[in-house]
Regions:
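Short, basic/aromatic beta-hairpin or loop at an interaction surface
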Residues: 29-43
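Short aromatic-glycine-enriched beta-strand elements
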Residues: 19, 29-33, 80-85
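Generic alpha-helical hydrophobic packing signal
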Residues: 7-11, 23-25, 30
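Intrinsically disordered, low-complexity, charged/polar segments
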Residues: 39-67, 79-81, 87-111
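Short beta-strand-centered aromatic/proline hotspots
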Residues: 18-26, 68-78
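Short coil-to-beta transition motif at edge beta-strands of beta-rich domains
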Residues: 1-14, 54-73
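A short, compositionally biased micro-patch
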Residues: 13-16, 24-26, 36, 65
Length: 111
């Protein structure tokens, strides 16, 4: 069984077109994920959810919810949530909590 934490970003392996989902509720046997890009919510059995944790790598480019592009310099994980240390196109460094990643990212092969 996968470990879920409210606020984590996941994708549905069966429905990549939903974009990035966010854990909004965890029950004993189920996990609820909202997919803001489509406005849909799914409830999955925790034991066999077709979900893949989204975890970008150093050097990857990601998009914030406001559309800014950032290059990942490092990442830290605390209590199951990732904060990316990034550099914007002007060379300024900022911290980007995973919850502020663009909801419209669509992944073909999750990292």
């Amino acid at each position: 069984m996968q470990d879920f934490v409210i606020g984590q970003r996941w994708i549905s392996a069966a429905e990549l077109q939903l974009g990035l989902g966010m854990v909004i509720e965890i029950e004993h046997r189920t996990v609820s994920i909202v997919f803001p890009a489509t406005g849909e919510t799914r409830i999955y059995a925790r034991a066999d959810a077709p979900l893949t944790r989204v975890k970008f790598r150093v050097g990857d480019w990601v998009e914030k919810q406001d559309g800014d592009l950032l290059r990942i310099l490092e990442l830290t994980e605390t209590n199951g949530l990732i904060v990316y240390r990034c550099e914007n196109e002007q060379g300024n460094e900022i911290d980007l909590p995973e919850g502020r990643l663009s909801n419209f990212l669509q992944l073909n092969q999750p990292g």
